[in-house]
């Protein structure tokens, strides 16, 4: 419906010879007395064109040529808002698209014929997944679902950090525990990983090799075994949330030289040097970001010879361009806030267009369990583990709670609320709407022989005229725009909010409008309206990655 209004507004702008660079935004008014939809395009354009906004709004309304039976009236309000009052029969007729399109209803065309890569989770294989990583995983998975809903062919990628100092520390940590099992007394470094899983890996190695590795100086046997076990565990945990990646990019390949003896990391250094953005001082190699107006240069290779995170991240992004993706989406934790702008600047210097690179930063998570906040620390061994949370509240609650607040906001995960079987729990509230519809349709089949799988006759919903029915139909029509908006903002929370509003509208309709006891034609129409809502809920649940129970 919103796309219909946008097209008509664009026609009016052209007809009135008004040229503006402002985007046309359609909103739902706070009160029905202001119409069904509204736009502030006249206000925005007038500011740009230095014109009176109310006069421009009145001029535009004079150029509207809506098809008969679609819009009952338009009115100018306030300083230049244009309100639209829709024809109820048109709303109901439009909502019947759900029956024709089914699971495809609400999908966009923005990404048709295009590819997108969404990188998310990308946790170092140094320990079990924490709750903080879980939030980024669900956020990325939902963003990938939203991209697919807009027509993109999506590649879901995990950047596998299998190189660098942390992997060395992992190997050393396991080796120390192995040596303890061999009877050696070890002063375990405070900088190393102390989780119980380290001891479990050491026990596995000890059971297979005995003391044969005691005098092996290399940590490689310990590192590789730990990496394999931990990464398998990470994939299993993600699978519990329905998160499956299409590809895994190994960081060590960025350190591997090609036939010319140059690694991707070195290639980045060489190309930035050619552009005049590499400096050598204090024993380190620096990205000369002071030339870009920043206060300090950023280290790419430390004095120890170890690359900083920025260098492989730049090289990794170069490979994404080389693979030809039309859109590059990265989902990072809050610890990347200071780093990613430098990566983008380097890519620009290297000649890459960063207009299609999107970044989603998710903030930290704390969990409240019996009124106590649990801290996360993989090295210390008292980690707040994602598996434990899933065990406690289930995968659906875990997913939805991770995205029911803006990614930009710190998330307090209320475990007690996530387990409640009441309307206060947003997961229960959404899924109960679907289960209630399924129960209604089963009852309708047994009592009046209503077949929910049957395609209704065109115009069946036009029999419905009550406010509750119309508001529910309006909600159905907003599904596609909600999905598009959530994708453009990389904000699945917007989709959660929309789904909650649909559930609320349905519950109100269910309470206020008798269904099976209504006149036969009205009963049939209301049942088909419920079928349409069920389809919208299923389509939305698919994006959010939660189940659609038929009974609760």
Curated annotation (Swiss-Prot):
Primary location class: cytoplasm
Subunit structure: Monomer.
Name this protein carries in UniProt: Arginine--tRNA ligase
Pfam families according to UniProt: Arg_tRNA_synt_N (PF03485), DALR_1 (PF05746), tRNA-synt_1d (PF00750)
Chain segments annotated as coiled-coil in the UniProt record: none
Gene name of the encoded protein: argS
Domain of life of the native organism: Bacteria
Keywords: Aminoacyl-tRNA synthetase, ATP-binding, Cytoplasm, Ligase, Nucleotide-binding, Protein biosynthesis
HAMAP family: Arg_tRNA_synth
GO molecular function: arginine-tRNA ligase activity; ATP binding
UniProt short sequence motif 'HIGH' region, positions renumbered to this chain: 123-133
Subcellular location field: Cytoplasm
InterPro entries: Arg-tRNA-ligase (IPR001278), Arg-tRNA-synth_N (IPR005148), Arg-tRNA-synth_N_sf (IPR036695), ArgRS_core (IPR035684), DALR_anticod-bd (IPR008909), Rossmann-like_a/b/a_fold (IPR014729), tRNAsynth_Ia_anticodon-bd (IPR009080)
Organism in which the protein naturally occurs: Chlorobium luteolum (strain DSM 273 / BCRC 81028 / 2530)
SUPFAM superfamilies given in the database record: Anticodon-binding domain of a subclass of class I aminoacyl-tRNA synthetases, Arginyl-tRNA synthetase (ArgRS), N-terminal 'additional' domain, Nucleotidylyl transferase
Catalytic activity, EC: 6.1.1.19
GO cellular component: cytoplasm
Annotated disulfide bonds: none
GO biological process terms on file: arginyl-tRNA aminoacylation
UniProt catalytic activity: tRNA(Arg) + L-arginine + ATP = L-arginyl-tRNA(Arg) + AMP + diphosphate
Family label: Belongs to the class-I aminoacyl-tRNA synthetase family.
């Amino acid at each position: 419906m919103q796309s219909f209004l946008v097209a008509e507004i664009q026609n009016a702008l052209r007809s009135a010879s008004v040229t503006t660079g402002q985007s046309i935004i359609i909103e739902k008014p706070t009160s029905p007395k202001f119409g069904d939809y509204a736009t502030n395009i006249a206000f925005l354009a007038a500011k740009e064109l230095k014109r009176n906004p109310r006069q421009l709004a009145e001029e535009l309304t004079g150029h509207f040529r809506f098809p008969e039976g679609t819009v009952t009236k338009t009115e100018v309000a306030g300083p230049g808002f244009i309100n639209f009052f829709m024809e109820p029969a048109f709303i109901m007729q439009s909502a019947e698209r759900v029956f024709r399109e089914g699971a495809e209803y609400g999908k966009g065309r923005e990404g048709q014929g295009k590819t997108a890569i969404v990188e998310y989770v990308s946790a170092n294989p140094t320990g079990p997944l924490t709750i903080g990583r879980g939030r980024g995983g669900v956020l990325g998975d939902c963003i990938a679902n939203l991209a697919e809903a807009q027509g993109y062919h999506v590649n879901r990628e995990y950047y596998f950090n299998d190189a660098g100092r942390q992997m060395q520390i992992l190997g050393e940590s396991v080796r120390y525990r192995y040596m303890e099992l061999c009877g050696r007394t070890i002063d375990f470094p405070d900088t190393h990983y102390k989780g119980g899983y380290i001891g479990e890996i050491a026990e596995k190695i000890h059971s297979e090799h005995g003391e044969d590795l005691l005098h092996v100086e290399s940590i490689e046997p310990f590192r590789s075994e730990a990496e394999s076990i931990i990464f398998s565990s990470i994939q299993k945990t993600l699978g519990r949330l329905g998160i499956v990646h299409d590809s895994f990019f190994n960081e060590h390949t960025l350190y591997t030289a090609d036939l010319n003896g140059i690694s991707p990391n070195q290639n980045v250094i060489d190309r930035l040097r050619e552009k005049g953005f590499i400096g050598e001082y204090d024993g380190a190699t620096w990205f000369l970001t002071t030339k870009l107006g920043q206060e300090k240069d950023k280290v790419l290779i430390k004095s120890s010879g170890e690359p900083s995170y920025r260098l492989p991240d730049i090289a990794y992004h170069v490979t994404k361009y080389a693979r030809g993706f039309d859109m590059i989406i990265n989902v990072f934790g809050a610890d990347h806030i200071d780093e990613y702008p430098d990566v983008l600047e380097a890519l620009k210097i290297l000649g890459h267009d960063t207009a299609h690179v999107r970044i989603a930063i998710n903030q930290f998570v704390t969990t409240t369990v019996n009124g106590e906040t649990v801290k996360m620390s993989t090295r210390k061994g008292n980690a707040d583990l994602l598996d434990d949370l899933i065990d406690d509240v289930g995968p659906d609650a875990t997913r939805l709670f991770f995205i029911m607040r803006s990614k930009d906001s710190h998330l307090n995960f209320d475990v007690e609320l996530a387990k409640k079987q009441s309307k206060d729990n947003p997961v229960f509230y959404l899924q109960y709407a679907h289960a209630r519809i399924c129960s209604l349709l089963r009852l309708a089949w047994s009592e009046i022989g209503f077949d929910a799988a049957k395609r209704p006759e065109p115009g069946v919903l036009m029999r419905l005229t009550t406010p509750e029915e119309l508001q529910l139909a309006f909600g159905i029509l907003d599904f596609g725009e909600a999905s598009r908006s959530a994708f453009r903002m990389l904000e699945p929370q917007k989709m959660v909010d929309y789904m909650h509003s649909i559930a609320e509208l349905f519950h109100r309709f269910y309470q206020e409008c008798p269904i099976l006891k209504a006149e036969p034609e009205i009963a049939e129409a209301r049942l088909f309206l419920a079928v349409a809502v069920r389809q919208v809920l299923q389509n939305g649940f698919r994006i959010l990655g939660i189940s659609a129970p038929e009974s609760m």
